[in-house]
Swiss-Prot record:
Name this polypeptide is given: Olfactory receptor 5AL1
Family membership noted in the UniProt record: Belongs to the G-protein coupled receptor 1 family.
Keyword GTP-binding: no
Keyword annotations: Cell membrane, Disulfide bond, G-protein coupled receptor, Glycoprotein, Membrane, Olfaction, Receptor, Sensory transduction, Transducer, Transmembrane, Transmembrane helix
Glycosylation site list: 21
Cytoplasmic-side segments: 66-73, 135-157, 242-253, 309-329
Intracellular or extracellular location(s): Cell membrane
PANTHER family in alphabetical order: OLFACTORY RECEPTOR
Topology within the bilayer: Multi-pass membrane protein
Source organism of the structure: Homo sapiens
Gene Ontology cellular component list: plasma membrane
Main location: membrane
Length: 329
């Protein structure tokens, strides 16, 4: 991390000074969601409650999976990592946003901004591929239940998760380094409530065509690749469910994928809205609204979606509560 800091600061300084005829920017100021002081206090309270709910929901789900032997399956192994990524995703933005709600000047250094961008992109990419891995897991469980243990062994699960984290960090690092090659001068005001690539590119005073093309290609590629895996998996699942003769069997097969399908629809919908679109049609104000939903709401909803619609999770939670009640008595 120190090496990354040194590279970013040195590269940013060298490139900005080389442009000349401009005052170099070393920190940024966020406009936030609103300039209304009373509304900012209200938003602080809302964001704090939602962030704490995200923490309790996601880490509660992780702990429940860890201490419940009946949940020690590939599906819940992936779900525990999705919960971790969800909370990390929110934590890359929410703490700084909460502080800014209470500050008159919402400033941040270039280094801190770069770290936030890198973490944000890393966890977005991780979530994309985790959702696609979970879709494949549901495909195997429904279409090839007898081969489930053979097709998705423990070692494969670990390799898939490790690959997701490594690839996500690589994409985040590449995008952050590419952003450091931009020159930021004169204006240092970012029209957003956190440091994202899109508003940063809009602020740059150097040529941004390469960076914009890179952002579009990488965002489009990762969204499309993961979405194709999801669509193919659910295509096979859909036809497999149609071949089930009993209504009860169809209902059981569908219920195992319903929560995951709900989560996918919400997440991909906001991602497609936010990133793979041309600059001329991109509204930063609309991006703020989508970002609040993507960064704050979805990571909080996911534990509820997977808990309330999943009988195995509800049964495991019920057993834990019963054990606690017996221990208290």
């Amino acid at each position: 991390m120190c090496a990354l800091k040194g590279f970013l600061e040195e590269n940013f300084y060298t490139y900005s000074v080389a442009k000349g005829n401009h005052s170099t920017v070393y920190e940024f100021i966020l406009l936030g969601l609103t300039d209304n002081a009373e509304l900012q206090v209200t938003l602080f309270g809302i964001f704090l409650v939602v962030y704490l709910a995200s923490f309790m929901g996601n880490f509660g789900l992780i702990m429940l999976i860890q201490i419940s032997p009946q949940l020690h399956t590939p599906m819940y192994f992936f779900l525990s990592h999705l919960a971790f990524v969800d909370f990390s995703f929110t934590s890359s933005v929410a703490p700084n946003t909460l502080v800014n709600f209470l500050c008159e000047v919402k400033s941040i250094t270039f280094y801190a901004c770069a770290i936030q961008v890198c973490c944000f992109i890393t966890f977005v990419v991780c979530e994309l591929y985790l959702l696609s891995i979970m879709a494949y897991d549901r495909y195997v469980a429904i279409c090839n239940p007898l081969l489930y243990v053979i097709l998705i062994p423990r070692k494969l699960c670990i390799k898939l998760i490790a690959s997701t984290y490594v690839y996500g960090f690589t994409v985040g690092l590449v995008q952050t380094v590419a952003t450091s090659y931009l020159s930021f001068c004169d204006s240092n005001v970012i029209n957003h409530f956190y440091h994202d690539d899109v508003p940063l590119v809009a602020l740059a005073c150097s040529d941004t065509h390469v960076k914009e093309l890179m952002l579009l290609i990488i965002a489009g590629f990762n969204t499309l690749c993961s979405l194709v895996i999801v669509l193919i998996s659910y295509g096979f699942i859909f036809f497999a469910i149609l071949r089930i003769h009993s209504a009860e069997g169809r209902q059981k097969a569908f219920s195992t994928s319903a929560s995951h399908l709900t989560s996918i629809t919400i997440f991909y919908g906001t991602i497609i809205f936010m990133y793979p679109q041309p600059k001329s049609s991109h509204s930063l104000n609309m991006d703020k609204v989508a970002s609040v939903f993507n960064v704050v709401v979805i990571p909080t909803l996911n534990p509820l979606i997977y808990s309330l619609r999943n009988q195995e999770v509800k049964n495991a939670l019920k057993r834990i509560i019963e054990k606690l009640c017996l221990a208290v008595k």
